[in-house]
Amino acid sequence: MNEKRMPLSAIETPAVIVNMDVLESNIAEMSRLAREAGVRLRPHTKIHECPDIAKLQIAGGACGIEVGAIERALCMAEAGIDDILIAHPFYGDHKLAILRRLLDKPGLKITVMADMIEQAEEISRVGQALGRAIPMLLKVNTGGDRFGVRPGEPAVRMAKRLCRLPGIAFQGIYVHESGGNPTPEGMDRLALEAATMAVQTARLLSKEGVPGAHVSVGASPTLRATCALLKGKRFPEITEIHPGHCTIGDMWHVRALANAREACAAAVLCTVMSAADPRHVVIDAGYKTFGADSLIQYQDMPGFFWQGKPSFGSVQGREDLWPGRISAETACVQYMEPDPAPAKRLRIGDRLEIVPNNATLTISMQEKIYGVRRGGVERIFTVAGRKDRTPAV
């Protein structure tokens, strides 16, 4: 252990800490699953938005990374990441100006996404102006009902239109499954349905002579189910998977079966500011730190409410505490026992580590997060997505 490292006690609260042992274990597990399934791993980085964590993922076996918004691609590219897929279709002059900046970077492979011809036509004009063909995937909606064209014939028709555009190099299709019943059987079913629709569409494309061998599926809740299908060689057309949240984990994905509780790497480090009320303590972190996601979609699950309130996270090592009342800059952590023993009572100045409900929200509100190991700070990660990336148009 490096004795010169900052001790955990020196971190000003509230702050987000990441357990490096757990983070590294999660990265290794994702890579192992993809490798055994015989597909490339391209993790989505929205949960951490940290180039240095992305580099750990690439060093661990990922072929590149995925971002949601094109602005995040710029942050990652400027930090030296050289293979980036932009998972969300985009449109408008502001976004195209960022695309041009990305395409100006030597050695950078950028792949874009479309689900409407209008998006693709704008990107086509950029490609023509630069004298190059921009790699593009077609987003296919297999049930998430956000972005995407319908699988099968609608996707084939759109793919043919994309192939006819100059300045575009059509690569294949992209599927992101979401929803499903949060049970092992529900995740198995969701993975099977998404993979089936993706592969049926890919086979139709091949039959129609449409080039595009890239078939990408996946999500954190279905990671293991998808890899089990692929390991069984049922869907050889699938070439890539793109889970993201299970890199870090949170209580959302514990409920969604993407992570075990012990695989949650991130926590909010906070300090008890008041213990005046015997029923609870007040901490120095509120929804400006945690975000305001109560995970109400899981309200029918056992243990979701306590005394009529959902929680905003889970206290590490203290199942007898309920973080259930939250305001802007403070929150109340309640004792679940009516009269806890003195040894169980928190005192002013005590510190808690609380796994947030939605780590994506929590981390997105930080400028930095602390990588910790054995009671000390091993490294500090910059959350690059926080930076202003408005280009000159």
Locations of the language-model features?
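Active-site loop/helix belt of alpha/beta enzymes
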Residues: P135, T142-A258
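C-terminal accessory subdomain/extension
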Residues: R279, I283-V393
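Generic N-terminal amphipathic, Lys/Arg-enriched alpha-helix
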Residues: M1-V18
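Conserved, mostly hydrophobic/aromatic
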Residues: L23, K46, M76, L138, ...
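Active-site loop ensemble at the mouth of alpha/beta enzyme cores that anchors a bound cofactor
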Residues: L223-G308
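N-terminal glycine-rich anion-binding loops that anchor highly charged ligand groups
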Residues: N2-E3, V22-I53, E66
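Active-site-proximal beta-alpha core segment in soluble small-molecule metabolic enzymes
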Residues: H44-P182
